[in-house]
Amino acid sequence: MKIIIAPLGGLIGAILGGILWAKYIQWTGNTAGFIAIGIGALTGIGMLLTCSGAIETNAKKHWLMVAFGAAVFAIAGIFIGKYLDVQWNAVPQIAEQLMANEPNLLEEAAISIAETQYSGQTKWEHMKDRMDWFDLLFGLIAVFVAFYITFNSRVRNIIYKFGGSN
């Protein structure tokens, strides 16, 4: 039963990290790709906390699989964050840009135009438009962080002591 529950920590970390990233973008207006590293950390720690009772500390082959799982969940968390960013923030930001370019444009008209522009593209196109090359770099670092947290025995021991496991 414990082995079935083990990946839930990574999934919860990915979802929580993605939501927090999208909210950060909504609150500040900055994409802040470096927050992806936090998604990797949340995913790795979540995976580690839920796996701690199911896998022996020195079972390297099992921890390697857990580390790959954490890396996959980190990627999923980044996509969740980008998807929610588009869902929550694309139309208001397009409307703000329209009003900045056309000072006489009313907010209702700008939102209507923004919704038309938004509906003309797929979510994937909007996600690509809202990503920079630095986001890819931070995404790779996030994947490494998630992998490293779960695979490195010293980090595991620190988390175990903090989490009260083993």
Positions of predicted regions on the chain:
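Core subunits and conserved enzymes of cellular information-processing
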Residues: L42, L48-N166
